[in-house]
């Protein structure tokens, strides 16, 4: 895995937020390490008065307490909004059956609507919390948690986020908890991805950044080519999530007068 100077990484992330979000930000705080890290960085960059944290649970669990811990440690203003009535209303209005992944996508998009509603009313920007591991594998909801004005962690792998979090003082209990999108009880990122973040990041760095072949990666990491192919497939199949909608070109169809 690449070796970063994490002290300098923190400085650069803080400078990025300070330069691009002077008017203040709204952040969705889930109780996980990514959103906690962004909240800590933003507070360091802008001061606590320019941060609003939204805690938006669908069901009550320990994540809410962890999210409150982050906000209260930082002294930032925060609101707890129960999204269950909103999500359930949408679900009951549809004449199609939804599996739990589809329901999870609705939750993520409802949270996006709330974040932007507050950001618009306050004249602020939305800071995203996605990391590079999620971004490259498409492990986010399109127009949901993937939607933001700026994403400070977008080039920081998940295993690197843990290092940044430790440096800036995120509570150890949050750094060490199992990563979860909180979409349903017992859900974890690594179960859904089918691979640990530690191995995933090693594979992604070699596959995407170093552009090594599958054979080279498998040999270097002593893993099967099937695992490398699994990650490669995650990257390829989620390409549409990483770009704006596209359509066919028509410039060549101009009729000369």
Swiss-Prot record:
The keyword Magnesium applies. GO terms for cellular component: cytoplasm. Pathway: Cofactor biosynthesis; NAD(+) biosynthesis; NAD(+) from deamido-NAD(+) (ammonia route): step 1/1. One of its GO terms (biological process) is NAD biosynthetic process. It is an enzyme of class 6 (ligase). Keywords: ATP-binding, Ligase, Magnesium, Metal-binding, NAD, Nucleotide-binding. Belongs to the NAD synthetase family. This is NH(3)-dependent NAD(+) synthetase. It comes from Pyrococcus furiosus (strain ATCC 43587 / DSM 3638 / JCM 8422 / Vc1).
